[in-house]
Amino acid sequence: MYEEQIDKMINTINHHATRYNSKISSKVIEALRQTPRHLFVESNTPYADRPLPIDCGQTISQPFIVAYMTEMLDIDPSHRVLEIGTGSGYQAAILSHMTNDVYTIERIPELGKKTQQILNKRIKTRISDGYNGWLEEGPFDRIIVTATADSPPQALIDQLTDGGKMIIPVKNPNGNEDLVLITKKNDKWDSTRLMGVRFVPLVKGYKGVDYGKA
């Protein structure tokens, strides 16, 4: 039913990647093909290459951005990966095709509970404050943040392993948003700007009690 839409999505993703002198690997493309995006968003065109609205005023990211962020993390099957901002659950589902050790945090209980019903049970979920990461389960080899921060949260950097990477949208001095790749080495970190983006803001705190892991 969705085969043509999926093929078109993949072609568009590959086209966008060339504009950024990048290439989306076959393993990421396969993860996109195996993850039914239409289960994560209510839309007549769930595979269109654009962000779409979901519940609670949030969005599901543009497929190219999902693919690009996943690609830039260079995830190995042995890696422990933390996602900040579960949202629809689509990005976490993609990550679960790259490694069996995926953790994801959502601050909005309505979204967190809904995605817990959709996601594979081996994905560890939590309804809590993403700014604080998941200290009890850290450290993590990779962290992906799906909301824009004023600056990279120190708690997340602290929870990266030596040699670990984090991809995160960050506000720049002009008030715009940059997608940034952070690499940690010997308790120091540096960042590389990848592209301009637009995400919902990363909000401190959470709406309700801390539900812990599920």
Regions found by a protein language model. Name each.
Residues 214:
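Glycine-rich phosphate/pyrophosphate-binding loop
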Residues 74-190:
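Conserved nucleotide-cofactor-binding alpha/beta core module
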Residues 1-82, 90-94, 98, 111-119, ...:
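Class I SAM-dependent transferase core
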